[in-house]
C-alpha cells in the first residue's frame, strides 16, 4: 500500500477496525476513509454502492461484522447469519465493481470444524461439522471467504481472507450477555472485587461501632478476627462450563499489525491464520485474570452451561514462514486491557455523577 493511498476501514469503531485504523495512522498512512454506521449502513446495498462510487477507495479492510459470545450466538442466530451475509456481500461486490486494488476480509477461527485436529491448519476448512453454538456466524464467515475466492477466480481481483484467533484488547465488548470469555471475566472479577471492597468498608463501620459499645461496657475479651476486619469476603465468581476448554488469545494490536503486514506481503486466495500458536485452558485464564485484577474470592464453574468447542488452537506456520510473529504476551495484553477497562468505568461513573439539566430547569449560575 502506498502511504497516500485511499484506504477504507469498514467497522472502524469496533474492536478490530479501530485497532487497524490506529495501526495505519501510526504507519503514516494519511488518507483513511472512515464511516460510522449512522453515516453508512453496510446492510443497505444502494448506500454501499454509492459510497464506493463516490469515495473510490483503493484498499479495503473489511472488519465490520456482528460478533458475540456463546449466549449471543444462541439467542440471535438469525441476526448473526443475516447481518453478516449482507455486510460482506455488499462490500465485496461493491469493491469489485469500483475496481479496488486489494481487499482484506476478516474471518474467524470458528469456521473450523468442532472436532478439528489441533492445531487447526488452513486446509482443514470444511472438513467436518461446525460447532453448533456458533454455526450461523461461522457459515456467514465461510461464505465471505468463498466470495473472495470466487471473485478472484472469475474477475481477477486481489481479495485475501485472514482467520484470526480469539481477540481481546481496548474497545472490546464487556457486556456480560454478549461478550466473549476474556472480557467477560475481566468485568466479572473487577465487579466482584469492587463489591468486596464495599462489603469490607461496611463491615469496618459495623466493627467500629461494636468496639465502641464493647469499650463502654468495659469488656476485656480480645477482639475476634471479624473485629479486626480479617473476615474472608465469601464472594464467588461464576463461570460457564467446566473450565477445561482450551483457547488461544491474540491482542487486537497484534492482529492489526498482522493485517497491515499481510495486505503488503500476501497475495494468495487461500485463507491464512493469524494467532500466537499457544493456548490456555479457561480455568487457567480465569486464574490469570483473577490475579491481575486482584480479586480474592473464589471461582465457581456452572457445569450446566455449555463449554463450546473443546479446543481452538490455530496453526500459524504459514504466517510465521512469511516472517510475522506477535509481540504482546497474554499477561501483558490483559494488564493493558484491564487498565483501559478501569479507566472507562471511571469515565462512565464521572459522567453519571454530573448534574443533569432537565427541560424547564435552570442551571445554577
Model-assigned labels for residue ranges:
Residues 3, 89-134, 160, 173:
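Conserved Rossmann-fold NAD(P)-dependent oxidoreductase catalytic core, especially the SDR/UDP-sugar
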Amino acid at each position: 500500500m502506498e502511504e497516500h493511498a485511499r484506504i477504507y476501514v469498514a467497522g472502524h469503531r469496533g474492536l478490530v477496525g479501530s485497532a487497524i485504523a490506529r495501526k495505519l495512522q501510526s504507519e503514516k498512512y494519511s488518507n483513511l476513509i472512515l464511516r460510522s454506521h449512522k453515516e453508512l449502513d453496510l446492510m443497505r446495498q444502494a448506500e454501499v454502492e454509492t459510497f464506493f462510487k463516490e469515495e473510490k477507495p483503493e484498499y479495503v479492510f473489511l472488519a465490520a461484522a456482528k460478533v458475540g459470545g456463546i449466549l449471543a450466538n444462541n439467542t440471535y442466530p438469525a441476526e448473526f447469519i443475516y447481518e453478516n451475509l449482507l455486510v460482506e456481500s455488499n462490500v465485496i461486490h461493491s469493491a469489485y465493481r469500483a475496481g479496488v486494488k486489494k481487499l482484506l476480509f476478516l474471518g474467524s477461527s470458528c469456521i473450523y470444524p468442532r472436532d478439528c485436529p489441533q492445531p487447526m491448519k488452513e486446509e482443514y476448512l470444511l472438513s467436518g461439522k461446525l460447532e453448533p453454538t456458533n454455526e450461523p456466524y461461522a457459515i456467514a464467515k465461510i461464505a465471505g471467504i468463498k466470495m473472495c475466492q470466487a471473485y478472484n477466480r472469475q474477475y481477477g481481483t486481489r481479495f485475501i481472507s485472514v482467520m484470526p484467533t480469539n481477540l481481546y484488547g481496548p474497545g472490546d465488548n464487556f457486556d456480560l450477555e454478549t461478550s466473549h470469555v476474556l472480557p467477560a471475566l475481566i468485568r466479572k472479577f473487577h465487579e466482584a472485587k469492587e463489591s468486596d471492597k464495599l462489603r469490607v468498608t461496611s463491615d469496618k463501620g459495623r466493627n467500629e461501632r461494636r468496639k465502641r459499645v464493647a469499650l463502654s461496657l468495659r469488656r476485656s475479651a480480645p477482639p475476634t478476627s471479624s473485629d479486626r476486619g480479617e473476615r474472608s469476603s465469601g464472594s464467588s465468581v461464576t463461570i460457564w462450563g467446566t473450565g477445561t476448554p482450551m483457547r488461544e488469545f491474540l491482542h487486537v494490536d497484534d492482529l492489526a499489525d498482522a493485517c497491515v503486514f499481510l495486505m503488503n506481503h500476501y497475495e494468495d486466495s487461500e485463507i491464512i491464520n493469524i494467532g500466537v500458536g499457544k493456548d490456555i485452558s479457561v480455568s487457567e485464564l480465569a486464574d490469570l485474570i483473577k490475579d491481575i485484577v486482584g480479586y480474592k474470592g473464589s471461582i465457581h464453574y456452572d457445569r450446566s452451561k455449555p463449554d463450546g468447542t473443546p479446543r481452538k488452537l490455530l496453526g500459524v506456520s504459514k504466517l510465521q514462514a512469511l516472517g510475522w510473529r506477535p509481540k504482546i504476551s497474554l499477561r501483558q495484553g490483559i494488564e493493558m486491557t484491564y487498565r483501559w477497562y478501569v479507566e472507562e468505568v471511571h469515565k462512565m461513573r464521572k459522567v453519571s455523577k454530573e448534574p443533569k439539566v432537565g427541560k424547564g430547569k435552570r442551571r445554577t449560575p
